């Protein structure tokens, strides 16, 4: 990566705390932590996937798994133990709220944040928040002090409506183009309010452009270039970019 001026920021690790013990999950995450530490990464991206449906083409996104109210306390406590385990090795655990998982909606994000402690950080994903019915600005306002990583993903409202009304899977939504980059006129996510709040709270982590799209339909170079330019312009306008990125 270095010859191309690139850095390895982090990587996804699937948690299975609903079906495995904390000790087993510590063992499972350790090789990933070793890689992150070797690469100089600061955050470890995690998400509970034991009952997730985002990778199942036969499952309608409308049928995302739901965690019973009396299960949140234990789940949150277990995540906090894994977060402490990561923190002891110099890595912040950042939890990715994600479509097709138990932490998808605004209420679920709030329940998760309420049931975890200070070691657990939030990966604020603007696209997954919007798609899940949450307001990215409201999440930023409420939780920025615990946000450790930001994914700047846009959503095409017309496609997200199709996913809901036609009972499509998450994967089919992605194939149809539900996600796109910052700056795309077809997108519905307002990024500037989130970036402004991040700047006001002294956020110094990464802003990651994410937008899984069919490369045969939408040119990756063109869209990534649009996303990067738009995000840089917005970061500068809102005061988040101090001129050193």
Stretch-by-stretch model annotation:
Residues 218-243:
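C-terminal helical cap(s) of enzyme catalytic domains, especially alpha/beta-barrels
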Residues 208-212:
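Short acidic/histidine-rich active-site segments
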Residues 11, 77-184, 188, 236-243:
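Acidic/histidine-rich catalytic cores of soluble enzymes
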Residues 20-25, 134-136, 218-222:
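Short, solvent-exposed loop/turn segments at secondary-structure boundaries
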Residues 1-11, 27-41, 80-88, 112-117, ...:
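Acidic (Asp/Glu)-rich catalytic clusters
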Residues 12-23, 69-72, 178-185:
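The substrate-binding groove and active-site-proximal loops of carbohydrate-active enzymes
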Residues 19-124:
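Active-site acidic/histidine proton-transfer and metal-coordination neighborhood
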Residues 1, 36, 93, 125, ...:
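Conserved, mostly hydrophobic/aromatic
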């Amino acid at each position: 990566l270095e010859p191309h001026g690139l850095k390895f920021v982090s990587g996804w690790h699937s948690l299975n705390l609903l079906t495995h013990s904390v000790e087993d999950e510590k063992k499972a995450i350790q090789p990933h932590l070793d890689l992150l530490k070797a690469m100089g990464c600061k955050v470890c991206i995690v998400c509970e996937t034991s009952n997730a449906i985002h990778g199942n083409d036969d499952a309608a996104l409308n049928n995302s798994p739901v965690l019973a109210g009396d299960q949140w306390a234990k789940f949150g406590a277990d995540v906090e133990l894994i977060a402490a385990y990561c923190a002891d090795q110099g890595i912040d655990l950042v939890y990715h709220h994600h479509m097709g998982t138990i932490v998808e909606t605004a209420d679920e994000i709030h329940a998760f944040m309420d049931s975890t402690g200070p070691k657990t950080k939030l990966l604020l994903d603007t696209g997954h928040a919007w798609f899940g019915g949450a307001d990215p600005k409201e999440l930023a306002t409420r939780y920025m002090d615990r946000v450790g990583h930001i994914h700047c993903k846009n959503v095409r409202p017309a496609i997200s409506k199709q996913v809901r009304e036609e009972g499509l899977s998450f994967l089919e939504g992605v194939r149809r183009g539900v996600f796109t980059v910052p700056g795309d006129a077809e997108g519905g996510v307002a990024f500037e309010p989130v970036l402004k709040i991040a700047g006001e709270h002294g956020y110094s982590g990464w802003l990651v452009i994410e937008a899984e799209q069919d490369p045969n339909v939408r040119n990756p170079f063109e869209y990534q270039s649009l996303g990067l330019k738009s995000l840089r312009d917005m970061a500068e306008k809102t005061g988040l970019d101090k001129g050193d990125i």
